[in-house]
Amino acid sequence: MALNVALMYPNVKWDQWISRTAWDIHPYNLGLLAAMIEGKHDVRIIDANFDNLSPEEFSRNLEENPPDVLGISVITNEYSQSGIIAAEVAKKINPKIKTVAGGVSAISYPKPFIESSDVDFIVRGEGEYAFRDLCNFLSGDGAFPEKGVLSKGEGKVIGSGKVDFIEDLDKLPLPAYHLVDYK
């Protein structure tokens, strides 16, 4: 079964302590993740940071096209709270949406994501293959990823082991830039 997957950068201004966008970053990693799953799952990219979406606008986006999986990329520790807010918004729309946190913050400081009841999975390390395998598992096609994914359930965190570095970058597809809305 194909999943409806939304990949997103949260708006850093959702964190009460941050008053402005520090930078607009090209969604390279979201494009790469999208390319890894695009042939098997329906995927879109939401750049709430670049588009300066409010939580309410983000919520409407999810209501109009509800995902089965929301992948949240948090690119620096200072913005962890924005990622958690994105997961909260998604779970308010539909508690069955599977939320997945990834990015630098999930690798270097996963504690806020582990403590949030709105984050279901955490991808740690180079997550291209781990995220693809997690989506396939959630769609009923494959086993839980052997490496790189933390899962929360029954009051404890279950890890699937440390992900290996991707040694041959030429094996990765080109990012799915056609999914990025350049205004």
Task: Write out the residue ranges for each language-model feature.
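Extreme N-terminal starter segment of soluble prokaryotic enzymes
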Residues: 2-5
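Short beta-strand segments
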Residues: 8-9, 73
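Proline-centered helix-kink/hinge sites
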Residues: 10, 26-27, 67, 110, ...
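N-terminal [4Fe-4S]-dependent radical SAM core
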Residues: 11-14, 19, 146, 151-183
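Glycine- and acidic-residue-enriched helix-capping/strand-helix junction motifs
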Residues: 16-30
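Glycine-rich beta-alpha loop elements in corrinoid/cobalamin-binding modules
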Residues: 29, 36-166
